[in-house]
């Protein structure tokens, strides 16, 4: 998959713009604050219906406009194209259109436009809360296992019912038992999908990381959210009193985590910020390879401030790994000269200069 056309209106400081990007490498360069990251944010909105820069809606919409809109034409892996559009207003109303029809959920966008983000906050995947790593894991499972979304929705519904009962005692014994059975069934299905995904991801991650960084002894493991030697139904029964005291369910897939350890310690406590970023890059590129295999198409990479915290050797290694995916990449940087030697001469590269929210396409820097 790739975006052949992008139209952006009223996203932060960007002037209304229509872009025709390269199906491979796109470099957006300009001074800090010029609007480069806002272009990536607009693409992120189109693919996930949310910003990666803010949980609040107001800062995303240009201060003089009532709503922001992003439109994209996607070239599909199987041939043909699909038109996607998203609009959000200041009241929070969201409109999603796919090929002229209203879409039911953002999951439909995500399925058509798989996006990977690598930015200066990427280290949070290692340092941050388990929720961030679950999101990473479930993004991958969603794109390779079509049954995952249904199981995840069943889990969320069962959890809401059980947690409501824990707080308010609104269910009778039979209803409580029924929801516990549904919770256990969905949990087991999700655990099966996640476990299979991690087994596929680990060798690809290890090979990818070896191209970027030599880290002997780094291990990636999966914790499913409850004792591996006990059934979830048994764990729920034994922790019922504690769950009632807390008002929520402590065990289950909603407590799962990915664990990266080095020399017996949490890797985030040992690795430098630059090393953490390379580990995260390897994880996200490995996910891209699995998407390629499962969907016979590529995800799109949004790479914000690529030179940040990486020396020339590692920048070039990362560029080569992205290039080997044969996917579409959008990269921002202040000085595009730092990326001059990153690509094969036959790889299509489009250059865009961003200044005060205006975007102009410039000549390929290798010509």
From Swiss-Prot:
Which GO BP terms, alphabetically?
DNA replication; DNA synthesis involved in DNA repair; double-strand break repair; SOS response
Residues annotated for ATP binding in this entry: 30-37
Query: Which Pfam families does UniProt cross-reference here?
Result: SMC_N
Q: Which GO terms describe its molecular function?
A: ATP binding; single-stranded DNA binding
Q: Where in the cell is it found?
A: Cytoplasm
Which terms in the GO cellular component ontology are assigned?
A: cytoplasm
- State if Isomerase is listed as a keyword: no
Main localization (coarse): cytoplasm
Keywords annotated in UniProt: ATP-binding, Cytoplasm, DNA damage, DNA repair, DNA replication, DNA-binding, Nucleotide-binding, SOS response
Q: Which family does it belong to?
A: Belongs to the RecF family.
Per its database record, what is this protein's job?
A: The RecF protein is involved in DNA metabolism; it is required for DNA replication and normal SOS inducibility. RecF binds preferentially to single-stranded, linear DNA. It also seems to bind ATP.
The UniProt entry, under PANTHER family, shows: DNA REPLICATION AND REPAIR PROTEIN RECF (PTHR32182:SF0)
- Return the protein name: DNA replication and repair protein RecF
Say which species the protein is native to.
Ectopseudomonas mendocina (strain ymp)
Upper lineage is:
Bacteria, Pseudomonadati, Pseudomonadota, Gammaproteobacteria, Pseudomonadales
């Amino acid at each position: 998959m790739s975006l052949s056309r992008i139209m952006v209106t009223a996203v932060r400081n960007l002037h209304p713009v229509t872009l025709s990007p390269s199906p491979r490498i796109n470099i957006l360069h300009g001074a800090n604050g010029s609007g480069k990251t806002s272009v990536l944010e607009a693409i992120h909105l189109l693919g996930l219906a949310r910003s990666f820069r803010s949980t609040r809606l107001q800062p995303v919409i240009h201060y003089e406009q009532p709503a922001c809109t992003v439109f994209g034409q996607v070239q599909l892996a199987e041939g043909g194209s699909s038109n996607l559009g998203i609009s959000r207003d200041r009241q929070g109303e969201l409109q999603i259109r796919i090929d002229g029809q209203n879409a039911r959920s953002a999951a439909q966008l995500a399925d058509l436009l798989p996006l990977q983000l690598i930015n200066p906050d990427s280290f949070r995947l290692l340092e941050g809360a388990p929720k961030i790593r679950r999101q990473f894991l479930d993004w991958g499972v969603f794109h390779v296992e079509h049954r995952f979304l249904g199981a995840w929705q069943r889990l969320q519904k069962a959890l809401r019912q059980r947690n409501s009962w824990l707080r308010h005692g609104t269910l009778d014994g039979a209803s409580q038992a029924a929801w516990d059975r549904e919770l256990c069934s969905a949990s087991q299905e999700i655990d099966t999908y996640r476990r299979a995904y991690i087994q596929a991801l680990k060798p690809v991650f290890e090979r990818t990381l070896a191209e970027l960084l030599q880290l002997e002894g780094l291990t990636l493991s999966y914790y499913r959210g409850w004792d591996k030697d006990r059934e979830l139904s048994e764990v729920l029964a034994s922790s019922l009193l504690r769950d009632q005291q807390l008002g929520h369910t402590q065990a289950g897939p909603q407590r799962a985590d990915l664990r990266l350890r080095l020399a017996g310690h949490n890797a985030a406590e040992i690795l430098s910020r630059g090393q953490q970023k390379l580990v995260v890059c390897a994880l996200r590129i490995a996910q891209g390879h699995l998407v390629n295999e499962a969907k016979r198409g590529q995800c799109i990479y949004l790479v914000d401030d690529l030179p940040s915290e990486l020396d020339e050797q590692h920048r070039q290694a990362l560029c080569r790994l992205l290039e080997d995916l044969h996917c579409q990449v959008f990269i921002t940087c202040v000085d595009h000269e730092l990326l001059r030697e990153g690509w094969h001469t036959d790889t299509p590269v489009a250059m865009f200069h961003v200044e005060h929210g205006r975007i102009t396409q410039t000549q390929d820097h290798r010509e």
